[in-house]
């Protein structure tokens, strides 16, 4: 049965079906008000040629506010992501027929599909719509130059001739040409199948959009990916209605050097093969899905801008016909001249407190947002109301575990441990940044209070940010939750241990935590050195191996001389607080604990004096400090009870 007979819309060609799909997306994925704003944004800026209304790269970049400067030669415009975004949009606009229609002209229908895909709104229209856009995003970034037929002395077969005829009207991207490889991953494009199923056009899909295997053979060039990553790092905190210029203007050379270094650290996680000149699909898919799940979130907020028009904001303007390129430039210049005062600086992720971070900066917090979730839902930490409260810093409080205990154990919420150092016994001064996300409050080893139901599903993670991004996820298996393998362990004698096995105490000698599972971090009792362990195997510990780990890889052991260690308390969303008292924030709870400990210590000291014990002043002072929990050898755990 032909596709035309089975299609209720009477459309049989990819172009017609693509248009019908865009209409369905527009009707089901946007509210009437959003669609009105969308149309105004598009048609008020659209160019026209031969009756076709469209956007070019300049219009797209100008509207979104994406800089088009060359980072190496134009200090005033250090970002150059405009061509990369335009390439991605031209590919996504052809969905679900990238094989024959990409690169697409950016008509209104194409832009509708782009916005639906990048803002993940397609679940409203596609029953089988998988929210994993990884294959589409890879195809939009891969080096996909036009397919050039190879010269051959042999005559083409009938099948080859029919294939060429079927594709002659739109050569498309080579990434979508079929090929014979042996990639063993599920080859079905669920999102494309769902789109065609929704139009009752599966036969057209089978005829024209054969299973794409060449995507597994193409690669993303390092330069292309770096330019995109630099933009994502700069605009990661962007909210849907915020101006991009608040993030992309005023970037000095020092900030851009920091952005480039962070981008290179992320690129290193994809293990790009220099000989092949880029990032493979397999490395891209595994690393994004398991190690950087929120990497493309900034594009969601960026393309939400299409759904709000300043022209319709509390005023009506007469309709203008399609603009020429000259008129478009004049209009943009007029808007720039009449723009209001500059936007206020973006809100900081960190709260004011007892110290300012020597490690966290806007670029590094953007990197954290690519994999750290919010405490309340599956969104990244920058897209929520979560804030970081300064709890402990060696730069501010010194390298004493006494102060560490006093500040950290009284914090009743999740914490972020982050440290910087360099390799011990090495001439290299390269800075290495490590960290751990600990979702439960730190507790004493004798604590019997169970974790709340809201925090029990949150998993810890251990990570390296530089010089190479490495992410070790928490182990969800209940078998990994044992009393002797807590997530975090604290002792004034042995120091701090993350993801280690704790030996039984001995009366004859001092025992020390040992590395266990796929990852662990050990910090000595003077907070001067740290050991980071990562292995490609080990599913019985707190942390699992990294996404791109290979069984052939040797275990990694880094011994660092520490520069700085910081603990940041995570202040949850107000409506989803983990506090026992919903009326108190974690900051207020910590303050109350300090006040209670001080009163309790003073009370017990007075009782001790009245009873006649502790004749010496030194003994009395020690009693006061021990009662307050400031000194002593109590081991401290977090997450050790499962």
From Swiss-Prot:
- Briefly, what is this protein's role? May be involved in a process influencing telomere capping.
Sorted UniProt keywords: Cytoplasm
Pull one GO CC term from this UniProt entry.
Answer: cytoplasm
Q: Where is this chain's protein located in or outside the cell?
A: Cytoplasm
Q: Where is this region: Disordered?
A: 149-171, 319-352
The family this protein is said to belong to = Belongs to the RTC5 family.
Disulfide bond residue pairs: none
Q: Does the keyword Cytoplasm apply?
A: yes
Q: Which SMART domains match?
A: TLDc (SM00584)
Domain TLDc: from-to ranges: 358-571
Q: Where is the composition biased (Acidic residues)?
A: 326-335
Name of protein: Restriction of telomere capping protein 5
